[in-house]
Design a protein with these regions (language model features):
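Charged low-complexity intrinsically disordered patches
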Residues: 117-141
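Residues in well-ordered beta-strands of folded domains
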Residues: 20, 114-116
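Generic "edge-of-domain/loop-turn" microfeature
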Residues: 24, 71, 106, 120-122
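Generic low-complexity, intrinsically disordered sequence content enriched
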Residues: 23, 60, 75, 86, ...
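Compositionally biased amphipathic helical and low-complexity segments enriched in hydrophobic
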Residues: 40, 99, 129-130
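Low-complexity, intrinsically disordered/propeptide-like segments
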Residues: 35, 42, 92, 131-132, ...
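Short recognition helix of helix-turn-helix/winged-helix DNA-binding domains
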Residues: 1-73
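Winged helix-turn-helix DNA-binding recognition segment
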Residues: 34, 46-113
Length: 141
């Protein structure tokens, strides 16, 4: 099927998932698979909506619900692969710690997922803390 070109401001009419560039630049995050990075971006997008809807726990932390079946369809993968992508992100499953899942309670309930802030690491060994003070510090003569 042939596709048309974009003209003028037409590209602005679409919703886009934003993928933080830090996922490709940070030493602790660049090893994530592209699908895990995309999954994090989708979850981050959902977290914005959850905040707008007031989905905060008692500590004020934003959480999301996302049906696994919907994510499987979005990423066009199977249940096993989706589990692998989640495990890459979930610190409790040996991943990088960008998400935390609280198990669902009851049949038909989705896990409560906390999408963590990549810009505010809690572990001082994370290389984000070594970020130069000035953007010009990246350049060397």
């Amino acid at each position: 099927m042939p596709y048309e070109y974009f003209y003028n401001r037409e590209p602005e009419q679409y919703v886009h998932y934003q993928m933080p560039s830090i996922l490709f630049e940070d030493d602790n995050l660049r090893e994530l698979s592209i699908n895990a990075k995309f999954l994090y971006s989708v979850l981050l997008d959902r977290a914005k909506l959850s905040y707008k809807n007031g989905w905060l726990d008692d500590d004020g932390k934003v959480y999301i619900h996302y049906a696994q079946a919907d994510l499987i369809k979005l990423l066009n993968c199977g249940r096993t692969k989706m589990s692998e992508y989640f495990n890459e992100l979930d610190g409790d499953k040996g991943g990088v710690g960008l998400i935390e899942r609280k198990q669902k309670v009851g049949i038909g309930k989705n896990d409560k997922i906390y999408v963590k802030n990549f810009a505010k690491p809690t572990n001082e060994s994370i290389s984000l803390l070594d970020t130069p003070q000035s953007p010009f510090d990246y350049f060397h003569n």
